[in-house]
């Protein structure tokens, strides 16, 4: 049964009438451009065919009822006329409440709604299950009540809800790609202007995501340290962000910087340049160049930004040994575990899967999870 059928059937059973709309919003993977978002730089993600799906209908009162199919059909109810505060027990409900509250704060007027939510974006893998939920809820209200919001505004509202209501610091990339993704394309995003450019993906290329299943422990504290180091670097150059520093300016004075800060800055500057070049390489179908850029990105994350772990490096090496120069592979996400992403000709996927199955667990003692994805459409009716 599809997520659409599942949520529609649960909706009718729970609420006693049929849903009027079914909305989906996808998860995402970032192909290249790591830790560049909060430096006002460039990222190149694509939406994937794992998504959050919501069957819904408007109500003629001010009540919101939400059922979470993936959490034993837990039900949350709240009123649009009372202050919306955090739910004490259901963490999932706070993503919904936060999005609704922030839409209200933006002076959108809408009535009550019934929703049933289900999703298959793997949680905790760094594939943006939370952003896809936020964008799905925003799209539900926009569609049901014809709110004058575009995808970028729905994305910004979701980011605001996550930062301020849920209390988790995140950039804008995850929500933006979920809202604006385009089938068979990646999206080059300028994280300063929020400008986007759709970049066509070469035919016959699979987007493979492999979760190392290495439990991330350092990610929060180390992420904040990296942000501070980047801000220190920007201050040294008297610029608002590292986006505004050229590699030539950096090379001329690198020796004056604290050696660790210098390494962090070098990663951001070179990664921004790689990301812009990667968009051109993809568009021209130059998988060889894309592979080189992804390899450089991984080496930079490993040696200059120091956010990889041995398990991730091992996974990357296993995949690279199979694909050679026919594709690319690198760590994706915040670091210290999580996933790698590979762009691979479809005919090589079985060989990659076999090599990883035979070698990764033997070398690390951890079993990986393997996903083959297609670049997918952003949020909308399904």
UniProtKB/Swiss-Prot annotation:
Localization terms from the record: Cytoplasm
UniProt keyword terms in alphabetical order: ATP-binding, Carbohydrate metabolism, Cytoplasm, Galactose metabolism, Kinase, Magnesium, Metal-binding, Nucleotide-binding, Transferase
Domain of life according to the entry: Bacteria
The name this protein goes by in its record: Galactokinase
Protein residues bound to Mg(2+): 130, 162
GO function term, MF aspect, one: ATP binding
Pathway, per record: Carbohydrate metabolism; galactose metabolism
Name of the encoding gene: galK
Function in brief: Catalyzes the transfer of the gamma-phosphate of ATP to D-galactose to form alpha-D-galactose-1-phosphate (Gal-1-P).
Statement: the UniProt record of this protein carries the keyword NADP: no
Source organism of this protein record: Escherichia coli O7:K1 (strain IAI39 / ExPEC)
